[in-house]
Each structure stands twice: as structure tokens, then as C-alpha cells.
A protein has these predicted regions:
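Phosphate-binding/catalytic loop of phosphoryl-transfer enzymes
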Residues: 78-175
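Glycine-rich beta-strand-to-loop/alpha-helix junction loops that act as flexible
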Residues: 72-78, 123-126, 259-270
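Flexible, active-site-adjacent loop/turn segments at secondary-structure boundaries
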Residues: 76, 145-146, 197, 265
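ATP-binding/phosphotransfer module of carbohydrate and carboxylate kinases, centering on a glycine-rich
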Residues: 1-67, 90, 112-117, 163-316
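Structural motif
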Residues: 74, 102, 295-297
Length: 316
């Protein structure tokens, strides 16, 4: 039997999966997130987390690193060649062997596209858009936060939600039902100082995640109710998402019809975002005159690692 390991390293968690040569997932473990951009120790700290997970998976299955034919790591935050190279240096120091490192955005294509060709658009903790074209060329768009104009991820939505409420309460600019939803869900009054108290929650590690999640939840509740300010944000998200997707069509070779687009990340797969996703598809096709097949990833992204390794005969 041949063994392979797939690593899906995200901002909040990292999954390590052991596969055989028939694509069967034999076992899996999880650790904390391994995105170096979120860690005080940067890439060395991320390498420590990754190796701890790999070693835990090996130990659990009575295997050694030399028993593994190949390991494919798909890691959030690996956006530049220099980051890739530094990560490899750190992993080599820690005894890693026979492995490849890519940005995590690429494995969703290998996991969700029936032929391994397509565009993957991820909106989760962050945003990135990756593709593998008909020639096997790989391209990444976005992933650099405000520098690249990323929209649609959880932190961005939470920020936009707070801003709309701020505009209503503090600027008296536009009424939004988000204000009433915030009053209800956070137990605050629709007053300036009460709203600003949420900033302390966003800066508190113990409360930050739940506060962001609540802001996201009330945002989609307002969208479902047709709240005009919230719908304005949805239109921004869809327009920017369409621009990201079409950047791949313009810069790569997709001489197929329709073009596969795999949507991944919690905003696309775990939240009631149908209104947004429908508008995203509509704008993508309207701006390009092309047909696209949009699918939401319904399997663990880490399965894209084994598909990729066997497709490319890594370790063969």
C-alpha cells in the first residue's frame, strides 16, 4: 500500500489527512490554523504547527515520514515565491521529506472540479481566487486584503455591517434594519456610545470571533429581508467577485464552455448566501458573455490534495 498525506492549512484550523493510492481517506487529524500571517512567530511558527500535525497523524497510524510517498500542503498565506521558499526551508529543518507546497486556494479546484480544471473562489476568513487552466497553468488573484481589494470574506462583511450601523446611528445617513438586529442580538441601545462598545469586543480575543460571527449572521438576515443598504454591499461583493473570476478567464486559457467555478469557504458553503451567489453568477456571465458552471464545494477541501497528487503522479 502507498500512503499520501494532504494538508489543508487555513486561518482557523489545519486538517491533515492520510490517504491510500485509491483516494481513500484512512485517517485525519486537526490542529490550530497555520496561516503565518495570523501568527506572531510568522512562517517558523506555522512550520511548527504543520510538523506537529503531520507527526501526530504519523504516530496515530504507526507510520514514519519515510513511509509516505508524497505530502501535498495547501497553505493559506503562501502567496509569493519567497514565502513558499521560506516555508520549505523551515519544514526541511524540521525533517519534512517528499512534499510540495501550494496556496490553499488551488486544492478546491482539484476537489470540486470533475476534470481538475477551473476557477476556485474562496471567501472564508479571507478571500482568494485561484485557477488551473486547460494548459495546467496556475494563477492566483487577490489574497492580499485591502491591497488587492479583497471583498466578501467574513472580516470584510463584519466591517461593512458595522459601518452601515455606524452610518445609521452616528451619521444619520441611511436607515438600515441592521441597527435593530444589532440592538436585539448584542443587547445594546441604538446610541453612539453603545455601538462603539462593540469595538472593545472586536479587540478582545475572547469575544472577537463570536462578535464577528453575529455581525455576519445579521448581515445575511438583513439581505434576506431586502434591506437596501445590505443589498448594496451584496452588489459590491458580487461585482468584485465577478472581476476576480474573470481575471482568470482574461489571463489564462479556458477554451471550454462552460467554465467551472468552485465556490468554497464558509461564506459560500455554510451561510444563507444564495442571493449573493446568484448575483455573482449573473454578473460574471453578464460581464463576459461566457457561460459558467458554479458549484459549491461539498467535500472536504483536503480531498483535493490526493486528487492532485495522483493526477500529477507526485512521488511516482
Amino acid at each position: 500500500m502507498s500512503y499520501y498525506i494532504g494538508v489543508d492549512g487555513g486561518g482557523t484550523k489545519t486538517q491533515y489527512a492520510l490517504f491510500d493510492e485509491n483516494r481513500n481517506m484512512l485517517d485525519s487529524v486537526k490542529t490550530e490554523g497555520s496561516n503565518h500571517e495570523n501568527l506572531k512567530g510568522a512562517i517558523p511558527a506555522a512550520a511548527d504547527i504543520i510538523m506537529s500535525g503531520v507527526n501526530a497523524l504519523l504516530e496515530k497510524n504507526s507510520l514514519a515520514i519515510d513511509d509516505i510517498t508524497h505530502t501535498l500542503m495547501a497553505l493559506a498565506g503562501i502567496d509569493h515565491v519567497y514565502q513558499h521558499d521560506e516555508m520549505r526551508v523551515e519544514l526541511d529543518k524540521r525533517g519534512m521529506k517528499n512534499y510540495s507546497v501550494y496556496n490553499d486556494g488551488f486544492i478546491v479546484i482539484k476537489a470540486g472540479s470533475d476534470n481538475g480544471v477551473g476557477i476556485g473562489y474562496n471567501c472564508g476568513t479571507g478571500t482568494c481566487c485561484n485557477s488551473v487552466d486547460c494548459d495546467g497553468k496556475m494563477l492566483q488573484v487577490g489574497g492580499f486584503g485591502e491591497l488587492s481589494g479583497d471583498m466578501g470574506n467574513g472580516h470584510w462583511i463584519a466591517t461593512q455591517t458595522f459601518r452601515l450601523i455606524y452610518d445609521d446611528i452616528c451619521l444619520k445617513a441611511r436607515k438600515t434594519m441592521l441597527t435593530d438586529l444589532a440592538v436585539k442580538n448584542f443587547g445594546i441601545k441604538a446610541e453612539r456610545d453603545e455601538l462603539l462598545s462593540l469595538i472593545a469586543r472586536l479587540e478582545d480575543e475572547a469575544e472577537m470571533e463570536s462578535t464577528i460571527r453575529t455581525l455576519i449572521d445579521i448581515f445575511f438576515e438583513a439581505v434576506a429581508a431586502g434591506d437596501a443598504p445590505a443589498m448594496g454591499v451584496i452588489k459590491q461583493m458580487a461585482e468584485r467577485g465577478a472581476e476576480y473570476i474573470l481575471a482568470h478567464v482574461k489571463n489564462s486559457n479556458f477554451n471550454i464552455d462552460p467554465v467551472n467555478v468552485v465556490l468554497s469557504g464558509s461564506i459560500h458553503t455554510k451561510l444563507p448566501s444564495e442571493i449573493y451567489k446568484n448575483l455573482l453568477k449573473e454578473r460574471t456571465e453578464a460581464l463576459s458573455g461566457r457561460k459558467f458552471k458554479f458549484v459549491c464545494l461539498d467535500v472536504a477541501p483536503v480531498t483535493g490534495c490526493i486528487n492532485w497528487m495522483l493526477e500529477e503522479n507526485f512521488g511516482g
